[in-house]
Amino acid sequence: MKKYKIAVLKGDGIGPEIVEQALRVLDKIGEIYGVEFEYREGLIGGEAIDKTGDPLPEETLKICKESDAILLGAVGGPKWDNLPTDKRPEKGLLRIRKELDLYANLRPAKVWDALISSSPLKEEVVKGTDMIVIRELTSGIYYGEPRGIFEENGKRYAINTMKYTEDEIRRIVRKGFEIARKRRKKLTSVDKANVLEVSALWRQIVEEEKENYPDVELEHLYIDNCAMQLVRRPTSFDVIVTGNIFGDILSDEAGVVVGSLGMLPSASIGDRYALYEPVHGSAPDIAGKGIANPIATILSAAMMLKYSFNMDKAHDLIEKAIEETLNQGYRTPDIYSEGCIKVGTKEITDKILENLERLKDAYT
């Protein structure tokens, strides 16, 4: 029996309750596919600060480094907002990304037919949207030096530096091509090559890498045009790959196109490690009430199966079970609409588990 070690970082707010449901789904997947998942829990974020004074204790980092993948709930909350910046819960997550060199952020954006009215776009424009935005996460203008606010002759000025090395570009571009190859074989590279030298180099390297992926269709779009096309023709996108700042903007825009924050999973991937987490925050206002939507976390676990464990069929089975659950009318309060059946965190997972059992034969 194949065995995988998963670091489980439940975090703050609704984190523990939504992660608990994702683990129930993983256990069911293990049963269906004859795989064993071993969970090792670690502290992170506000909970870690309260217990150890550190948003990322060394013990947690050790657990992550000894695992095959990491599943995270959520970090942060108003309780810790007044702490010094370097001691806030979010610092724990940033440090994990840095320590494990998680350079590729994957943000799927899929419109579910049952939730199509949640999108701010017209149904005929958005129906069938299923894309993934891959954002370079560890370099670019957010990290470049020199940076800062300075004063000269009594006037202030500010500097930020956008810098990418060839290796940094090449590895994220390869990740884009590889993921496109596993999907619908179309890659959109987004840059500003008509103005920025960094983007000109980016485009050159994309063209060089294209030689290694002749089966993948490639298009180049400028960032401004891409931002427009995302709302004009979202269904035309499969995989988007881009730098840090452009990816920051486009991944949020793609999420709004979908319209349901509680349905958005994400992954941060490196060459050795990968971390999976929902896009939404810790929602402390509803923590412990049993009404949080666990679907984004369950979908994040499904991404883990696909991208860390190469269990593509298991990933597809989970997506199908969620789709069926939504089609049957079950909704947590955040995605509820009139005529549907309002259920809680555990109840919607119960329905997903029932559908996993019912649909499993088509995916094994």
Curated annotation (Swiss-Prot):
Q: Which UniProt keywords apply?
A: Amino-acid biosynthesis, Branched-chain amino acid biosynthesis, Cytoplasm, Leucine biosynthesis, Magnesium, Manganese, Metal-binding, NAD, Oxidoreductase
Question: Which positions in this protein are listed as binding NAD(+)?
Answer: 77-90, 281-293
Cofactor dependency? Mg(2+); Mn(2+)
Cofactor note as given = Binds 1 Mg(2+) or Mn(2+) ion per subunit.
Swiss-Prot/TrEMBL catalytic activity: (2R,3S)-3-isopropylmalate + NAD(+) = 4-methyl-2-oxopentanoate + CO2 + NADH
The record lists the membrane-crossing segments as none
Give the Gene3D superfamilies listed for this entry.
Answer: Isopropylmalate Dehydrogenase
Subunit and partners: Homodimer.
Protein name, per record: 3-isopropylmalate dehydrogenase
